């Protein structure tokens, strides 16, 4: 009986050790991909899934296409890409991928599997020659390019013309700076021009309408906006260097969803994406936050030393939800993390390497009274 009693204590101890670890990760288990798996570089600025199902990762040193098994790299050194520092990715209606870099814009042709420099001149005789901050598109097939040192460029595939927007005659931005630009499902353009307000345009930037009164009390004055994301119930979600905000566009109110971490420091929100209508994922400099809009519950996931299933790095720069319901997360130091769509309700239970455990093998299970 003494042997059975000791065995029971051993099993309880092992499972206690396992479940303490499982609780730290809130039941979320990620698969990591980095340079050891074939990724060109561990800093991932941009992610997209193309129409064929391939995943694309824009890194600090090359563009990678992933088929679920292996990577194909497009790099300057191999002659398949003109510049390696990728800043933004966008797939147009024809399946071409527009690639923003720190020195201009490139276009990938899925038919020929080649990348070409976009060298067209605009109506002001300016080309896209500097850092591209953002590439996106409208519902009419137009391509919009936000640059760091130049104005906004609009490319019309129907007319094959490039036009400068929001610029003076020299092609420079006619106001301070432009941050985020996003077209919603109604083809309304939302943007941030770094003056504390948000704006929208229903005529492709011919006119900009402020969301809030321009009375000196704009809610984002002094803030640096990193991400704009329209959501359900006529709300806009704004990621800033001091947290995550929800803007109710109906009554023009702002609600703070995330502001301080457990140490009291500001939460630097770089990226936000919807996992579902009720669940918002925020990539920050201090880990991944999952905010439930219905319950207002927050889950904070961080890298855990010795845990191969935790996120590989706390600095999150990009998030993409694929068509299968999985989430791909790009980090600054740890490559890509993948969280598959959950079809079962089983929790992953495993030991931590740094804990002095009495055993790692489970021989049998026994149901409790619940």
Residue map of PLM features:
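Carboxylate-rich, polar loop motifs that coordinate divalent cations or form catalytic acidic clusters
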Residues: 1-370
